[in-house]
Structure formats: structure tokens, C-alpha cells
């Protein structure tokens, strides 16, 4: 009904997006043997693990739950996906034909600005946001040019790709332990060390999951934490290291546990519980990207101690490439949805940065079209935290330290960046 109302109002998705959704629904609902479907396999795996650990259900009860799940899948859930695909297909004549951004709709610019504020927690003007992104992109670009000019070996084809083969750590648990050691001096300690388990994504879920993710804990149980790695994506070396920094320490896992337990003594931390009901994506993802950036420096120390040749210049090169790519996508997001950039204009710009394949440029444009502000949530959030860091250096002067700033950021907890800046200045 919702998509039908959107279509009738002229706000329906474009044909490429529709075809992707319909295909995803059809593939999700398809099965030869229900026992091989991901929702059957995942439910069975978790139910059997529960029964084995807690012994609260009899074999007969477990079997009854499995049968009930099968009935729901076969008779209700999967047919609903097929019905959704069929009904969406009927709306295809109402697809958006011009493949343009939000600004092409009535009040689209205003909606996009509201979306930025909501998803990033930044209250800056669009012009100020552009200036921040341009300045950061230029700084990364100049750093990259300087590195390549000073160290011509970076232009050798295999130099950067072979770095993963000599990276000192390969095991996820070992990397998390090393990250915990690296962050000690600059981050406040947790009241209690949480249980952390690294799991592989179930075979049945590999095609539907991100390369890695932290499974956010229930609000009443933050002691047992899980990070999932997806074997379908070949994360290794530096990429695995920085990803685990983002998801684990000092990233999402650490930030979540710290905020939950900082006030937990004899009473519940109602502040943290309330924040669980609110959305502060710019803070949480911006913070995770901020510590991911820091982890490149941790990697330099790790590799240098292990005697890896050219560790510093390779890590710095990869870090600047990574930052350039995300800031470029943020600028394109604004160009498409606020300034009205067309596919041809976006393609021309991407070509200048070496992205030449039509399939790649189309995929980037389509993703930005379908997911406005997603990259901004991460990167503008990151830039806002870097800005707060600079403000704190001016406010605290000789009392500044990275530890003090990180403690302030983590204790204040998830909120918008205007509130964070006000808190910082009020504590002057």
C-alpha cells in the first residue's frame, strides 16, 4: 500500500531499483528444499544451539518449534515475498523515468537538507558541508601526491597489493587483542572487560550480509558481544585490521559497552536505555569511521615493530586513498540530490579519477540515487568529530589530551553534533 501510494504520487523508485527489489524478493522466496533456505537453516542453527546450552526445551518441543517455523515459511512468509514482487511489478509503468536526485521533486531540496540533519546529526548549512568535504578531499589528495612523489616505489603495481601478504596479524581474535593494547593510552578503560566472540556468518546468510558487522547487543545485556565476519568477502591484512577497529575496538563494540556501563553501579543507566530508542547515526558511524582512521596509525606501529618494509608510507597511502574515495562519494551525493547532477556529469567526474568501466559508474550512481546521505552519515559524522577535536584543543589548551577528548566524546554519548559542541563549550 505504501509503495502504491508513492507511485500514485509520482514518487516511485526508478526501473533499475524496482528490478533489483523484485529480483531480490523472488530469489529470497525461491527454494528447492525448504531445509536449505537461509531462514530455516538460521532458525534451526540458533534453536539447536539454545537447546544445547540451556536444556530448557525437550527434543519434542524443539521439533515442534522447527515444524512451526517451516509452516510459517512455506505458507505465510515466502508467499508474501512473491506477492510483494508481483504487486511491485504491476507498478512498473509508474517508475521514475528520469533517474534524477531528490531535488527534481517538489520540495526535494528541503527534504534532502532535512534528511542530512536527521541522518548525520550535523546542523551545518549545505555550503559549509561542501566546504568541509572539499577541504578534506584536497588535503588527502595533496598528501597522496606528496607520498607518490617522494616514494616512487608506490607506483609499482604490486607494492600496495602485496602488503596484505606481509601484514603481521591474520587472526581476528589476535587483531582485536592488539587493538585493545594499542588504544589503552588514549581511550578510557571499560569498567569490566566484555566477552567478545568472533563468528563466521552462516553459509545460508553469506549472500545477504556485509563483509563484517558488530551485532548490537540488547539494551539489558551488553556483556556478551559478537562480531561477524563474512567469508564471502576476502577481508585480510590491513583491511581486516581497520575493519575490526571499526566494528570492535575502539569502534562500535567498545563505544556501545562503554556508554552502557559507565554509570551502572547499583541503579540502571536510564540515560543509556533512553538513547537506545533514539537515532544518532552520524555519531555512531562517524565515531566508528574516526577510530578506523586512527587504526591506520596503530597498523603503522604494528608493522614497523614487525620489520615490515615501507609500512608507514603504504599505510598512509592507503588511508589517503580511502578518505578520498568516501569524501568523493559524499560530494557526489550532494551533487546528485541537491545540485541536480546527471548521470553523464557524474560519469565524467568518475572517469577523471580512473573509474572507467560503465558498469562501475552506473552502480555508483544508482547506489547514491537509492541511498541519499548514507555516505554522509559516516563521513560527515567523522569530520564533525575531527572538528570537535580541534575545538577541544583550543578550549582546553595545555590540558588537552587525546584521552581527555575521547573520554568527553564517549561519556557524552550518542547525540547530535550541535549538542556535543554545546557540551564541550559549556565545560570550558
What are these regions (language model features)?
Residues 1-428:
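N-terminal maturation segment of proteins
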Amino acid at each position: 500500500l505504501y509503495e502504491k501510494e508513492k507511485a500514485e504520487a509520482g514518487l516511485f523508485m526508478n526501473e533499475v531499483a524496482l528490478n533489483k527489489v523484485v529480483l531480490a524478493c523472488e530469489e529470497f522466496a525461491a527454494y528447492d528444499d525448504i531445509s536449505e533456505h537461509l531462514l530455516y537453516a538460521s532458525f534451526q542453527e540458533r534453536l539447536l544451539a539454545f537447546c544445547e546450552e540451556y536444556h530448557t526445551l525437550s527434543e519434542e518441543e524443539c521439533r515442534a518449534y522447527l515444524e512451526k517455523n517451516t509452516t510459517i515459511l512455506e505458507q505465510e512468509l515466502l508467499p508474501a515475498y512473491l506477492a510483494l514482487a508481483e504487486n511491485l511489478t504491476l507498478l512498473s509503468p509508474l517508475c521514475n523515468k528520469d533517474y534524477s536526485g531528490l531535488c527534481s521533486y517538489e520540495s526535494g531540496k528541503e527534504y534532502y537538507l532535512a534528511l542530512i540533519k536527521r541522518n548525520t546529526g550535523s546542523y551545518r548549512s549545505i555550503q559549509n558541508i561542501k566546504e568541509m568535504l572539499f577541504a578534506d578531499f584536497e588535503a588527502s589528495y595533496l598528501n597522496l601526491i606528496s607520498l607518490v612523489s617522494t616514494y616512487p616505489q608506490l607506483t609499482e603495481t604490486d607494492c600496495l597489493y602485496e602488503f596484505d601478504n606481509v601484514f603481521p596479524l591474520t587472526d581476528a581474535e589476535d587483531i582485536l587483542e592488539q587493538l585493545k593494547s594499542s588504544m589503552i593510552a588514549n581511550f578510557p578503560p571499560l569498567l569490566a572487560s566484555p566477552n567478545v566472540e568472533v563468528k563466521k556468518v552462516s553459509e545460508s546468510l553469506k549472500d545477504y550480509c556485509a563483509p563484517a558487522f558488530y551485532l548490537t547487543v540488547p539494551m539489558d545485556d551488553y556483556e556478551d558481544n559478537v562480531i561477524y565476519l563474512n567469508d564471502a568477502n576476502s577481508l585480510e591484512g590491513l583491511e581486516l585490521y581497520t575493519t575490526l577497529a571499526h566494528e570492535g575496538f575502539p569502534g562500535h563494540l567498545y563505544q556501545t559497552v562503554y556508554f552502557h556501563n559507565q554509570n551502572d553501579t547499583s541503579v540502571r543507566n536510564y540515560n543509556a536505555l533512553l538513547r537506545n530508542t533514539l537515532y544518532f547515526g552520524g555519531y555512531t558511524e562517524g565515531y566508528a569511521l574516526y577510530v578506523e582512521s586512527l587504526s591506520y596509525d596503530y597498523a603503522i606501529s604494528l608493522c614497523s615493530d614487525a620489520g615490515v618494509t615501507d609500512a608507514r608510507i603504504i599505510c598512509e597511502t592507503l588511508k589517503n586513498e580511502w578518505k578520498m574515495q568516501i569524501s568523493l562519494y559524499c560530494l557526489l551525493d550532494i551533487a546528485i540530490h541537491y545540485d541536480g547532477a546527471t548521470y553523464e556529469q557524474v560519469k565524467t567526474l568518475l572517469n577523471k579519477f580512473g573509474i572507467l568501466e560503465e558498469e562501475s559508474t552506473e552502480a555508483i550512481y544508482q547506489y547514491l540515487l537509492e541511498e541519499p546521505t548514507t555516505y554522509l552519515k559516516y563521513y560527515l559524522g567523522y569530520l564533525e568529530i575531527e572538528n570537535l577535536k580541534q575545538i577541544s584543543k583550543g578550549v582546553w589548551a595545555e590540558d588537552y589530551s587525546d584521552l581527555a577528548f575521547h573520554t568527553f566524546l564517549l561519556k557524552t554519548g550518542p547525540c547530535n553534533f550541535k549538542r556535543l559542541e554545546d557540551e564541550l563549550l559549556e565545560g570550558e
